[in-house]
Amino acid sequence: EASKILHSLHDRYPDIEIAVLPTRYPQGAEKQLIQSLTKREIAPGQLPVSVGCAVFNVSTYAAIYRAVRLGVPLTQRIVTISGEAIAEPQNFIVRIGTPFHDLIEVAGGLNDKTERVISGGPMMGFAQKDLSVPVIKATNSILCLLKDVNGAAENPVCLRCGKCVSVCPMRLQPLYMYRYAKCENAKELSRLALLDCMECGCCSYICPSHIPLVEAVRSARNVLEQEVSK
């Protein structure tokens, strides 16, 4: 439906090319989009500008339009509240700074058996224990779950199956990154190009041992960034 609307407007903006890509996660990530649309590959540690590209999402473009053409600053955004644990899933136009618990209340409240509330999506979102946290400019979704979709184990053991490597869109080695992240080995993490990880969550999702690979990478990223900045 969105594609039809865009194509119907194409005659008014002939200098804009519209491309429809297959739905395949994480196709929407900037490096994957650039590779799919231009066949240009960004080298490890580089940014899109290094291959002459800039990527903006729909919300950013809309905010730029309102600011430049209408003189309206970014004070609100669209937030989706969904999941089995929310009474009335829906979309809201929300003022930045609105507490999560206010939105959840307007959406009918949480189920008594709610186990987790996530800011963001199921693959890249962050669990929120404090629902007084505010909506920020990057908040696009609040996901309310009845059970832990990741099924994390208490003492997970790597089986060396290699599935996490096979699904990584950045061609990294999550199993080794996890090992060195646990012992905060900055040298090896740098060698493995940890900073190129986009935290898409594919490795954690496919892991048969339910190892929290992305969680470990996020923690290690802070350690490595501190070492790089020295």
Label each PLM-derived region with a short phrase:
Residues 1-4, 55-63, 76, 87, ...:
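Conserved active-site and cofactor/substrate-binding residues in soluble primary-metabolism enzymes
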Residues 1-36, 160, 194-195, 199-204, ...:
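Iron-sulfur-cluster electron-transfer modules
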Residues 2-100, 106-113, 121:
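Hydrophobic alpha-helical positions that pack around
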Residues 5-8, 63, 67, 102-106, ...:
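Alpha-helical scaffold segments in soluble metabolic enzymes
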Residues 21, 82-84, 95, 118-120, ...:
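Generic beta-strand/beta-sheet core signal
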Residues 26-28, 32-41, 108-159:
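Active-site gating/interface segments in enzymes
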Residues 97, 102-104, 117, 168, ...:
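Short alpha-helical segments in extracytoplasmic peptidoglycan/chitin-binding modules
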Residues 140-155, 165, 169-230:
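Ferredoxin-type iron-sulfur electron-transfer modules in oxidoreductases and energy-metabolism complexes
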